[in-house]
Amino acid sequence: MMSGYNGDGVSSLPTRTQSPLARGAHPGAVLLSPKRTALGTLGGGAGGSSAQLMSPSQHSLSLNDILDQQAHPSRVDSSSAMSLDASIHQQQHTSGVGMLSPLLQPQASSISVKTAFLDSFGSRPSSAIGLQHGQGQGPDGPQSATGMSLNNSNIMVNFTNDVNQLCTWMSMLTSAQQNTVMDNLLSSLNEEVLQHTKLKLESLTNSGYLSPSLRPIASPIPSRVATLETSTQSASSAQLPGSLMLDSILSDSAAAGAGSTNSNNTNMASHSLAVNSMYRQWSPSPQMNSAQPMFDYLNDITRPRSAEPSRLRNGHTSHHQNGSHHIAMNSGNGAPPNSHSSTGHQVSSQAGGRFSNIKPQRPHSPTSLTKSTSSSSNFSEAQSPAAQPTSPGPSTPNAASNVSSSSNMNPKSLCDPKLLKNIPAWLKSLRLHKYSASLNGKSWQELIDLDDAILEDMGVSALGARRKLLKAFAIVKECKERGLVDESAY
């Protein structure tokens, strides 16, 4: 071998125009490149002449030796240069077309190199192992084509896993962290990739695309720790080594939790420790006490003053007492507004009707409110002292809310001449048509002078119905005194 090399090996070497390297360059310079600088020079700068290099399986250096020499460049000696020259000499005596190394193929060099860098943190990449195994069959056998197809599929699978892992990791970052990643990522992209990204952003902006809202980082999914604990051994072949590095950012104790799989108790303890560590790192500590309900922590938070029910009730009570023309003070008996209410009515008004008392004041104008206030005052003064304690009249807040909630309790509808002449229709407008038989024999002039005791004697047994009728009678009576009732109603 050495004699053949000394005899005609020099004459068979490629000239300077054919050589992929400069004349002054060391023959083993390609092996001294720590990354893909020399590989890119061979794959892109040499052009067609780079296609003459043989695969690593045909010379004495294996992929392990290449990786070892990249990690320790000082160990390169003259034997590596001689082996490279011998491989170039052997290439001239072959059939002319050899199987290229996958690391030097133009269409797969970038993918394989990037995948090797992503997967080489914990162990050797499965793609590189598959490449060596597939190329060991020889350049002429039919098994080499099958090996190449399997290698290409492995490269694409690993590349897809890398992309999915990177996208998943990016989605779990905050906006500031994503900006930092993009600043470092854009500086390493080619110009054509940047142009493509620019066009993509412009098209998305013109189409009205809105970026999806990021979920809060304060609550990482606790089940991810359990997944790492239980499926590390079963999914180690399908899961990339880089995924553990990306997931380890979530918790410092993920590795410790993944290794404790001796018993169920150990798994549960490590799982709870990992969850506590995650919540301690990303968000405030949650309520982990099972004896305390999850919603009890709301009592410790300072509530805004606008949401205090007690303040709202007190403010509404003061509004009724001070702002509504002192309706309750004009009753003359000094009884509290809710003295007639039972215990159940008070509970329901506090629980269900907490905010309903504010609504009745909206549909009424100040004029109608003044009229109703004055009419209720006049009516309360006309009542007898004996009837007032049992039935205080419609001057209470609950009665006023029930009356004003109806759209028909206004002077215009109550003083309609057509309705005043037809008492059943007038009662139907108040939704009290069930008492038409009891009040049908009287005119509206007689009805407005009735009091609570007379209505009860006439058959109006419901207290709410009597209050509603007395309120309507007071409004019609006030309109009559002011001359607002049409003459056709008489």
UniProtKB/Swiss-Prot annotation:
PANTHER family according to UniProt: PROTEIN SMAUG (PTHR12515:SF5), STERILE ALPHA MOTIF DOMAIN CONTAINING PROTEIN 4-RELATED (PTHR12515)
Signal sequence coordinates: none
Gene3D superfamilies hit by this protein: Transcription Factor, Ets-1
Function comment: RNA-binding protein involved in post-transcriptional regulation through transcript degradation.
Family statement: Belongs to the VTS1 family.
Subunit (UniProt): Monomer. Binds to RNA.
SMART domains found in the cross-reference section: SAM (SM00454)
Compositional bias segments (type: Low complexity): 365-384, 396-410
The species this protein was found in: Eremothecium gossypii (strain ATCC 10895 / CBS 109.51 / FGSC 9923 / NRRL Y-1056)
Segments forming domain SAM: 418-479
GO molecular function terms listed in the Swiss-Prot or TrEMBL record: mRNA binding; nucleotide binding
Region: Disordered, residue numbers: 1-29, 71-90, 305-410
Keyword terms: Cytoplasm, Nucleotide-binding, Protein transport, RNA-binding, Transport
Name this polypeptide is given: RNA-binding protein VTS1
Compositionally biased region (Basic residues): 313-323
Biased segments, Polar residues type: 76-90, 330-351
